[in-house]
């Protein structure tokens, strides 16, 4: 009898954990942009603009390849203020869409501009997919956005 109870408890636990992996509610809209392979230099290349009405938190997810070269930098700026400057480690094509970087960021009221660059005097080949989710949908100025990057389920 004890063995039966242990098996039932284990089965309940396994089924309960499996249920936790399924989304139970909508997270709202997602903004996503896929940049094809391009050469970066010291001049920042804008890849995505996200206008918001008021400051809000969001989850940033990105994956990239630099053909195993160091030096590419991901920037997030708003009205001349640098909100994020992340030097990207060398990454191979095999890591693209397999390894994702995830972190919470703050989007400031106004235009939040994501861009990429390489060190001065160097060029780095880069491909990136970037997405934002878990943000306050009401703060997003969708009419000022490229509709191709906004995914609303």
Could you say what each language-model-derived stretch is?
Residues 70-86, 130:
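Short, surface-exposed beta-strand/strand-loop-strand elements in extracellular ectodomains
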Residues 16-19:
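C-terminal motif of bacterial Sec signal peptides marking the signal peptidase cleavage site
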Residues 50-52, 92-108, 120:
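Beta-sandwich interaction modules
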Residues 21-23:
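Bacterial signal peptide processing site
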Residues 56-60, 104-122, 126:
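Noncatalytic modules at the cell exterior or secretory-pathway interfaces
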Residues 3-10:
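Sec-dependent signal peptide recognition
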Residues 37-53, 97-98:
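Short beta-strands within extracellular/lumenal beta-sheet-rich domains
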Residues 72, 120-134:
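Edge beta-strands of jelly-roll/beta-sandwich modules across compartments, strongly enriched
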């Amino acid at each position: 009898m004890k063995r039966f109870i242990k098996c039932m408890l284990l089965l309940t636990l396994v089924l309960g954990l499996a249920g936790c992996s399924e989304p139970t509610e909508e997270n709202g809209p997602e903004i996503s942009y896929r940049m094809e392979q391009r050469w970066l230099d010291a001049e920042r290349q804008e890849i995505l603009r996200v206008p918001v009405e008021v400051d809000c938190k969001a989850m940033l997810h990105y994956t990239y390849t630099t053909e195993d070269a160091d030096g590419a930098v991901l920037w997030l700026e708003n009205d001349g203020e640098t909100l994020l400057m992340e030097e990207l480690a060398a990454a191979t094509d095999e890591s693209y869409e397999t390894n994702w970087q995830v972190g919470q960021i703050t989007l400031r009221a106004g235009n939040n501009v994501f861009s990429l660059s390489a060190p001065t005097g160097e060029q780095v080949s880069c491909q990136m997919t970037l997405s934002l989710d878990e943000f306050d949908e009401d703060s997003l100025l969708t009419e000022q956005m490229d509709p191709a990057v906004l995914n609303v389920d």
